[in-house]
Swiss-Prot record:
Family assignment from sequence similarity: Belongs to the chaperonin (HSP60) family.
Localization per Swiss-Prot or TrEMBL: Cytoplasm
HAMAP family linked: CH60 (MF_00600)
The UniProt record lists the keyword Transmembrane: no
GO biological process: protein refolding
Purpose of the protein: Together with its co-chaperonin GroES, plays an essential role in assisting protein folding. The GroEL-GroES system forms a nano-cage that allows encapsulation of the non-native substrate proteins and provides a physical environment optimized to promote and accelerate protein folding.
UniProt signal peptide: none
Name of this protein: Chaperonin GroEL 1
């Protein structure tokens, strides 16, 4: 085991604070509409230029072990805020730096760090409650577009695209971001349920121009096993043929004689059918088949439920207005399922989302909700160069997270104003002793810091602006983009409540841990072994002069 360096008290804290400051100073220059860019070196290819706080934070790794500990703790603030709320990483970093910096002064003067932390926690809890009171719901397209634009570093075109996508697929719909093929941003919307399985044979195609099979008003047969024997399918095929409607078969697989017969019937025009594999694997496949059954108003024909293919009736088949089957995707539009059943299924999946432990499971469950409740929208990001594409794509993803957060918990005035207004709830707070009161003061001071940094990045005098905003009421604040004092909500400068709340809570949590640290243990740097000596010199010539 390598030897460790153990550092105590002020020496440990001082080094860690240096690390906090290095990271925070690099991140905070990106804050606000007039924030600056940071250039990140890449080991291959060109450098990345970004204004995204969390991207900058993730790149920072310091040589000094103790400094690096401090930096990594603040990096955790940025990452956690980004994961929970999708934005607010720079605000969280600025808040954490301020709480640590102010708190260290009190710790150095001999105050009890534990009481300081209690005071900080008390103030943050009061501020969060006040933020909830200030918050107003985010419902209109205009408000959603404003949130998206602010989060994408004041790019209104991104905000508009996200608002349009949400309008088309609903608040629960899946919105994904992909690289575009042109210079302009594009929005593709898939209405209905889409899953990533295509036709099992190209002979099913009936629209050669688009290379898809289109079924109008079809029945949908759902089966959880392989189908290889045509005898199993015959009874249900005869019933569908009598009804004179097309049929989509979704099964674990359709092969051999069964597939060949379906293809022949299709080519001869006897019965229009398409066969596709069921989406997903294992338990997820069963769940997705059940989702499709509920969406189309049918049943999954499975032995577990006592149903068999030979005895299947039309009543057990699902129905839809239209189904499109491509090479890789199947889209079910306007399924005949009961709205009540679909809502109940969505509610059930939501409960599973809350109980899910892994991010992957949560993401897959969220996709299922979206497919049942809304639809799927794809924002294709356009840019001139790959460097610009990466940077823009990251901003679109941030903005998307922020708009989801706004729809979830509402919005507050942006530009650091909400935190200034929330200070009113803390101003009258008192702790049990002087040390707790000092903790409350630390948070009071820290809540000015985001506004100060926005103003500083805009090249103005921070103290004057903070005093002017604090003297105002409600949504009155400073719009750094124009340099004017305005009603922030009317001007479209808004933040999701969840983002501001999460930033404050995470910053206080990590800053509190740093203040109450009294020892740090780090690995000693390995000393490089000296280079081995060179080879001894060659021996003299052996020749003898005659």
């Amino acid at each position: 085991m390598a030897a460790k360096d153990v550092v105590f008290g002020d020496s440990a804290r001082a080094k860690m604070v240096e690390g906090v400051n290095i990271l925070a100073n690099a991140v905070k220059v990106t804050l606000g509409p007039k924030g600056r860019n940071v250039v990140l070196e890449r080991s291959f290819g060109g450098p990345t230029v970004t204004k995204d706080g969390v991207s900058v934070a993730k790149e920072i790794e310091l040589k000094d072990k103790l400094q690096n500990m401090g930096a990594q703790m603040v990096k955790e603030v940025a990452s956690k805020t980004s994961d929970n709320a999708g934005d607010g990483t720079t605000t969280a970093t600025v808040l954490a730096q301020s709480i640590v910096r102010e708190g260290m002064k009190y710790v150095a003067s001999g105050m009890n760090p534990m009481d300081l932390k209690r005071g900080i926690d008390k103030a943050v809890a009061a501020a969060v409650e006040e933020l909830k009171k200030i918050s107003k719901p985010c419902t209109t397209n205009k408000e959603i577009a404003q949130v998206g634009a602010i989060s994408a570093n004041s790019d209104s075109s991104i905000g508009d695209r996200i608002a349009e996508a949400m309008d088309k697929v609903g608040k629960e719909g899946v919105i994904t971001v992909e690289d575009g093929k042109s210079l302009a941003d594009e929005l593709d919307v898939v209405e209905g349920m889409q899953f990533d399985r295509g036709y099992l044979s190209p002979y099913f195609i009936n629209n050669p121009d688009k290379q898809v099979a289109v079924l109008e008003n079809p029945f949908v047969l759902l089966h959880d096993k392989k189908v290889s024997n045509i005898r199993d399918l015959l009874p249900v095929l005869e019933q569908v043929a009598k009804a004179g409607r097309p049929l989509l078969i979704i099964a674990e697989d359709v092969e051999g004689e069964a597939l060949a017969t379906l293809v022949v019937n299709n080519i001869r025009g006897i019965l229009k059918t398409v066969a596709v594999k069921a989406p997903g694997f294992g338990d997820r496949r069963k769940a997705m088949l059940e989702d499709i059954a509920i969406l189309t108003g049918g049943q999954v024909i499975a032995e577990e439920t006592g149903l068999t293919l030979e005895k299947a009736t039309l009543a057990e088949l699902g129905q839809a207005k239209r189904i499109e089957v491509g090479k890789e995707n199947t889209t079910i539009i306007d399924g005949a399922g009961e709205a009540v059943n679909i809502e109940a299924r969505v509610k059930q999946i939501r409960t599973q989302i809350e109980e899910a432990t892994s991010d992957y499971d949560r993401e897959k469950l969220q996709e299922r909700v979206a497919k049942l409740a809304g639809g799927v929208a794809v924002i294709k990001v356009g840019a001139a160069t790959e460097v610009e594409m990466k940077e823009k794509k990251a901003r679109v993803e941030d903005a998307l997270h922020a708009t989801r957060a706004a729809v979830e918990e509402g919005i507050v005035p942006g530009g650091g104003v909400a935190l200034i207004r929330a200070r009113t709830a803390i101003a009258s707070l008192t702790g049990v002793n002087a040390d707790q009161n000092a903790g409350i003061k630390i948070v009071l001071r820290a809540m000015e810091e985001p506004l100060r940094q926005i103003v500083t990045n805009g090249g103005e005098e921070a103290s004057v602006v903070v005093a002017a905003v604090a003297a105002g009421k409600g949504n009155y604040g400073y719009n750094a983009a124009t340099g004017e004092y305005v009603d922030m909500v009317e001007a479209g400068v808004v933040d999701p409540t969840k983002v501001t709340r999460t930033a404050l809570q995470n910053a206080a949590s990590v800053a509190g841990l740093l203040l109450t640290t009294d020892a740090a243990v780090a690995e000693l740097p390995k000393e490089d072994a000296p280079m081995p000596g060179g080879m001894p010199g060659g021996m003299g010539g052996m020749g003898m002069d005659m």
